[in-house]
Every structure is written in structure tokens, then in C-alpha cells.
Amino acid sequence: MPSLASIVSRMRIAVFCSSSPTIDNKYVELAYELGKGIATSSNELVTGGGHISMMGAVSRGARDAGGKTIGVIPQALVDIEFADHDNDELHVVETMGQRKHMITDISDAFVTLPGGAGTLEEF
């Protein structure tokens, strides 16, 4: 039987957070550090697949620490060059609803960082 530590260390952790370019930089730094922490704990990061603000920072933090990143993004956001193509996996879906559904389906745990109405709507 696997140990609890080995099970926990293989989790996919979804992070919901702001993608606004106007959010206070202290939150962007917080997201980056969380991404690093997820990766150094041998977990995988799941995000909404964007490259800016907190969403981009959490992924950069995970990658900088050698972690795996998985993004899920609607085609409409890919079309406006919002996608983080540096993700190890980038799943493109049709709608925001499909994005939420896939993120919740593939993730084992969830973290919510500061954000606005879009972050709140994730729940």
C-alpha cells in the first residue's frame, strides 16, 4: 500500500486566481511562490491556461522549480493571444463552462488566490 506522502506528492492542484494586469504586484509574487511550492512538493499545477498576471506567475513559478504545468483555456482566449504556450499540456476547449468542468475533473485539490468576479465565478 502506498504511503500517504507518496499519494499527496502526486496531486494535481488547480489554482484559481486573477488574470487582471492591474492587480497589486504583491499578489502576483504570491502566485509565483505558490507555483514554486506546488512544484517543489512534487505536485502538478493546473490553471486556466493564461500567461498574464497571477495566472501566468503561478505557472512560471512552478516551471522555474521544475514542475509540470497544465493549462485549460477556451479557444476565444487563445485567439486573442492570452494562452501560455509554455505549459507542459495546454488543453483548448470551446467554452468557459467546459474550461471549469475540465479543470475540476482533472484536479485533486483546489486553491483560490485573490481575484475578481471571474475568480469567484469559478465556484
Give residue spans per PLM region.
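Short glycine-rich anion-binding loops that position phosphate/pyrophosphate groups of nucleotides
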Residues: 18-21, 51, 75-77, 109, ...
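Glycine-rich beta-alpha loop segments
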Residues: 2-68
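Short, well-ordered secondary-structure micro-motifs
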Residues: 26, 57, 81-83, 102, ...
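Short, well-ordered alpha-helix to beta-strand connector turns
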Residues: 42, 87-88, 107
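Glycine-rich, small/polar surface segments that engage phosphate groups of diverse ligands
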Residues: 47-96
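Structured loop/turn residues at beta-strand edges in well-structured enzyme cores
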Residues: 8, 85, 105
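Active-site/ligand-binding-proximal alpha/beta "capping" segment
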Residues: 98-123
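N-terminal alpha/beta PP-like core and its mobile active-site loop of ThDP/TPP-dependent enzymes
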Residues: 22, 26, 83, 94, ...
